[in-house]
Amino acid sequence: MHAWPASEVPVLPGKGRDLRIHDTATDGLITLDPGPVARIYVCGITPYDATHMGHAATYNAFDLVQRVWLDTKRQVHYVQNVTDVDDPLLERAARDDIDWVALAEKETALFREDMTALRMLPPRHYIGAVEAIPGIVPLVERLLASGAAYELEGDVYFSVEADPDFGKVSRLDAATMRLLSAERGGDPDRAGKKNPLDPMLWMAAREGEPSWDGGSLGRGRPGWHIECVAIALDHLGMGFDVQGGGSDLAFPHHEMGASHAQALTGEFPMAKAYVHAGMVALHGEKMSKSKGNLVFVSALRRDGVDPAAIRLALLAHHYRADWEWTDQVLQDAVDRLGRWRAAVSRPDGPPAEALVEEIREALAHDLDAPAALAAVDRWAALQEERGGTDEGAPGVVSRAVDALLGVAL
């Protein structure tokens, strides 16, 4: 599976700061020092509907992570998956009387278009769950052989009790885990499981649903969590720098993934930092495909909204914050974009070197994009009020905003 084209990232003079970022597992800021190649895995979409603002906010957060690392002159090895076979996808395809493969391909193509328009840097490896199945099957077989997994009526489940570190990623109590498991794709009430929280590793073939050869497992398809583990271990190995996604992935997805990896390798954690973006709401409720309360990136683009304004609307909120999408949020972003473009369109302006350092410092401190935007606002206001004589300043600002914030002026 291919990703989307990359936009060129300007190289800024000097060197950026090392990233200090909030780690869910420790509930605190940690400083990441990846070495010459930073490794990041971000959980991708289930392609049964278009990219909404909640998706965009999540991928914007981890695009900033990449940009901070690139500014420190590191290479970035970024991997993202696509859950291109899953119950919601199959259910939507059946509802709309469309082939599930065609639906997945259509929505994945639209996602690529949205990411390109928003100038999100693409992953080096963009891997679908289906294409990863040949690598998933041996992992499930290993877990069975080690006793970390068991069979139940043809299905294979992971035993959370096989992981002595289970629970350390999300830091939730058992009752909350059980509640969230039921809400987020688990089956805690299924009879015969050793522990209600045990997640499925391999689903035996169901009539009328797609299935693949699972070797000794029989025909079926993989569970959600083992898909990401297989892809991450194959392309990044253990101990990569960041595993990212929305805050609703901390449990069960990232918790279970860490447990699978621990049982397979004997190492913990799978990622040095578990980083989670906040939720975006509309009319008081979290944007959700199941609820249908969505604002789509593609719809805004069709309505003529500049993608740079959409990106600024996302950047106006700290990545970990929960916030609400409103018409005013978008209008504020449109107005800000206009002010910034007017400011950099002049032939000269106030000195900008200090501004570049302010943006760098803001982003290095847990991706504080609102602080970075405020710094650019101050420079733009100064430009409007009294201008300046530095002939290179507007270009410096334009390149810094492009390189660090992903906004083309």
Curated annotation (Swiss-Prot):
Q: Which GO terms describe its molecular function?
A: ATP binding; cysteine-glucosaminylinositol ligase activity; cysteine-tRNA ligase activity; zinc ion binding
User: Which GO terms fall under biological process for this protein?
Assistant: cysteinyl-tRNA aminoacylation; mycothiol biosynthetic process
Where, by residue number, does Zn(2+) bind? 43, 228, 253
Question: What are the binding positions for L-cysteinyl-5'-AMP in this chain?
Answer: 43-46, 58, 81-83, 224, 246-248, 280
Q: Which UniProt keywords apply?
A: ATP-binding, Ligase, Metal-binding, Nucleotide-binding, Zinc
Query: What cofactor is needed?
Result: Zn(2+)
Its Enzyme Commission number(s) read 6.3.1.13
- Highest taxon above the source species: Bacteria
User: How and how many cofactors are bound, per the record note?
Assistant: Binds 1 zinc ion per subunit.
Function summary: Catalyzes the ATP-dependent condensation of GlcN-Ins and L-cysteine to form L-Cys-GlcN-Ins.
Q: Which family does it belong to?
A: Belongs to the class-I aminoacyl-tRNA synthetase family. MshC subfamily.
- Name used for this protein in its record: L-cysteine:1D-myo-inositol 2-amino-2-deoxy-alpha-D-glucopyranoside ligase
